[in-house]
Every structure is written in structure tokens, then in C-alpha cells.
Amino acid sequence: MSVPSLNLVSDCGSCFGLCCVALPFAAGTDFAVNKAAGTPCRNLGTDFTCGIHERLRDTGFPGCTVYDCFGAGQHVSQVTFGGRSWREAPESAATMFEVFPVVRQLHELLWYLAEALTFAPARPVHGELRRALEETERLAAGTPEEILAVDVPAHRQAVAELLLRASELVRAAVPRRAEHRGADLFGARLRGADLRGANLRGALLVAADLAGADLRLADLVGADLRDANLAGADLTEALFLTQAQLNAARGDAATRLPAALQRPAHWPDTAEALPPAPGGGRAPRTSRKPQSGGRSGRPRRR
């Protein structure tokens, strides 16, 4: 996947630790302590690095290893605020912390738009996608005041409609594709399932067993993959899959990924032996589990 001129890959070394300060989190399975928005994490060093980075999952902070800012951190730090940190210019801190999550959302949309422009079957909408990408890039490049004035929900909805059209053009090549948009597949037994071209936009797949499943050309925008088993699954051509979704899931050495994404460091280097799929997997429910907030960046928005 190509990316636009803005860097959409996180570069923590060029960021002022914004995700460790701007965002709140609550003590629970993802974080060991409570932290209010705008308060530096107790593990954040004076050089804006994490003091327990190599031990986050072992010390009660797995949520930190899941989060991905799509490069918003370094953009806000080095471009929007010209390289002056919130410690150097404390009067700018509150505004910087407000701007960061807005830019993060815009960068996420840029990621999706850039990916959609690589889909050959979506050529009929490439012109609209390119214009949307340019507009989103313009919004993210604004001043702090301009960024805070962006109507993100309205812009996201307009982009979402374009992405859906692109997705439908690509997935049309797959006959008898499954329709699970927004479905409750919590803990579903989908081991070895043929989900090629499936619509899984916004689906709740928490703790679902997708080991050995074929997810090529499946639309995964906003799918909640927390603790989903992706061992041996084929995600090589999955649509709109993000690093945050992979980070939240469980995979192994046999999980096949798109070239643009990295294998999470906490995944094992070995491959799971995949027995035959158990029968009787439950059908999806139509209701949805409530979405938790916080820093984890769990992308269930469509």
C-alpha cells in the first residue's frame, strides 16, 4: 500500500509522548492504573520515552501495545506545533492534547483512503477517493485552531461512504460472500471458515476463533478483533485492516498478513497446530456489546 505525503506510520522518537499524556485510561485488563486525560503517565520519561516499554504487557499495560496513532503523534509534535514540546511551552499543552486525537482520526482516514486507491477494481471511484484524501490531508495540516474546528463525524461519514463503495467493487469478485456488517460474533467459532469477501465492517469479533480462516478480501473496517484467535489465518488481502487491530488480536508464525502491516512483537514465533473446526458454532446475534472507551484505539466506528 502506498501512503500520502504525511507519514502514517508511528514514529515515537519524533513525538512528545502525546499518547502517554493526552489520553485517559482506566485500571483494568488493559492498564494497571487510572490516568486522567492531560496527565503524564507515571512511566513517561523526561525524554518522552517509556520507562517500561519492553515490559508493558508483563506489568499490566497491554493496552499501550495495542494503540497506534497512524503517525499523528509526530505530526502534531513536529509540524502542528513546530517541534516545541508541551514541557518547553506549557501554555500550549492543553491545546496540543486536544489536537492530537483529532489528527489521529484524520490520519486513520488517510490510511484507509490511501489503501482504497490501490484497489484496481475500485477505479470508478478513484477520483473521488483522491479528492477525499487531499481534503483530509489539508484538514490534518491546519493550524491548531483550524484542526479543532473540523467536523470530524461529518467528514468521517463522507469518507466511510466512499470506502464502502470501493469495498463493494472489490468484493464483487467473490460469489456468495457473507454479510456480517455490525454483527455480534463475540466468541464465535469460525475456525477454518471461508470468509473471503465477507462484510465484517464494525463486527464484534472479540475472542472469536478465526484460526485458519480465509479472510482475503474481507472488509474489516472497524471490526473489533480484541483477543481474536488469528493463528494460521490468511489476511493477506484483507481490506482496511490496521496495525491496531492486529496488535489487539492473537496470531502466530503462520498468520499471513498484508505487506503494509507488521507482525506484533507479542505474537509467538511458533505456529499453532490447527485441529478440525468444532461443529455447532453459534450464529451471530444482531445486538452489539457496548464499546469501551479509553486509549486502546479500538477501531469500532463503522
Which role fits each region the language model picked out?
Residues 290-296:
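Intrinsically disordered, Lys/Arg-rich low-complexity segments
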Residues 1-4, 85-91, 274-290:
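Intrinsically disordered, low-complexity linkers and terminal tails enriched in Pro/Gly
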Residues 35, 289, 300-301:
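Context-gated lysine
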Residues 1-127, 132-148, 152-158, 162-173:
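Hydrophobic scaffolds flanking metal-cofactor catalytic centers in soluble metalloenzymes
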Residues 164, 171-284, 298-302:
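Tandem repeat scaffolds
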